[in-house]
Regions:
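Short, ordered loop/turn segments at secondary-structure junctions
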Residues: 15, 45-48, 68-71, 111, ...
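Juxtadomain coupling helices with adjacent low-complexity linkers
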Residues: 123-164, 229-230, 234-236
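Short hydrophobic alpha-helical runs that function as membrane-insertion/retention elements
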Residues: 41, 64-66, 106-107, 189-191, ...
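Long, charge-dense
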Residues: 134, 222, 227-257
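Short beta->alpha transition motifs characteristic of CBS
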Residues: 114-130, 237, 282, 286, ...
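Bateman/CBS regulatory modules and CBS-like beta-alpha motifs in cytosolic regions of diverse proteins
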Residues: 67-97, 109, 144-157, 163-195, ...
Length: 298
């Protein structure tokens, strides 16, 4: 009667069941399944007495499963199937997924489905408030592919799968004479189409230059950047927009909560977790299956 894998409705009689109670549960579950095609399982709320066991044996039937309580478990309520994301996706993409799916929390999972962390809309908002750490993008170990995606840019020189993991981010607003005093090795420099500024940044051993407003990059600059190991990216955005957007390229792994995550098993009873949920300020909690793998949010 019960079809494996489908959600079940349990059919029970009274406690300390007699033969009528158990036979009624078996018959009614079978009747409802035949009538609706849905999943009904006969159960019992106590031990089988000898008389009932004799009847079951006579008709070659197994005793219904014992159900010791009918408390609501996590698996009995709606679990929102918020898809897990990789730790390497950018803040921009995480924000987009939140808006698209109308959620405020995203779970970060491994390829095996294990929960690594969670990131909330509040975490993303806080990341925008860290205005004074010009090296935060390298501290976050940001992939160039994320920068390209965020800035809608093109990789002119370098490997998009490499990481920007050293140096600070700065805008080359001054002339080359002054740039020499504040550009340091491995820095990421946002600049315009001035040949002299691009040349100066590369000679000062910048790790990457971002050329704004869709400006072309000369063959000489490309060749020198290649020789010096300097990545070159072009973007259609102006320097102001580029500077505002680039922080959104950082991976969520740098900002997500990794420790002391409040998570529940699908076998947990709601009565046991209700108080825990009410005591926390956030609204979404990950749910794990019996193998410890992420299955959704409540």
């Amino acid at each position: 009667m019960a079809v494996e894998g489908l959600k079940k409705t349990l059919v029970l009689g009274h406690r300390n069941p007699d033969t009528d109670s158990i036979c009624s549960a078996i018959c009614y579950a079978g009747f409802k399944h035949q009538l609706t095609g849905e999943n009904y399982e006969p159960c019992r709320a106590g031990n089988v007495n000898p008389e009932t066991q004799y009847v079951l044996d006579y008709f070659n039937l197994k005793a219904p499963r014992l159900v010791e309580n009918v408390k609501t478990q996590v698996k009995d309520i709606e679990i929102r199937k918020t898809k897990g994301v990789s730790r390497g996706i950018s803040l921009k993409n995480a924000w987009g997924l939140m808006q698209e799916n109308n959620v405020v929390t995203l779970p970060c999972v491994t390829e095996e489905g294990l929960l690594e962390g969670v990131i909330t809309i509040g975490d993303i908002t806080k990341s925008y408030m860290n205005l004074y750490d010009s090296s935060i993008i390298s501290k976050a170990c940001t992939k160039y592919a994320n920068i390209l995606d965020t800035l809608e840019g093109s990789m002119v020189v370098g490997d998009s799968e490499a990481y920007f993991n050293q140096g600070k981010v700065l805008i080359a607003a001054a002339n080359p004479d002054l740039m020499e005093f504040y550009i340091e090795p491995h820095d990421l420099v946002i600049l315009g189409n001035r040949y002299e500024s691009q040349l100066c940044a590369i000679e000062m051993e910048a790790g990457c230059i971002i050329v704004c407003e869709g400006a072309g990059v000369s063959l000489t600059i490309r060749k020198l950047a290649q020789e010096r190991g300097c990545a070159v990216i072009t973007t259609p955005y102006d320097t102001y927009t580029t500077a505002r957007l680039i922080n959104q390229s950082m991976p969520i792994s740098y900002f997500m909560t990794k420790e002391n995550i409040i998570e529940f098993s699908e076998e947990d009873y709601l009565d046991d977790i209700r108080e825990i949920m009410a005591s926390k300020r956030h609204r979404d909690f990950p749910v794990l299956d019996s193998d410890g793998k992420y299955i959704g949010m409540i």
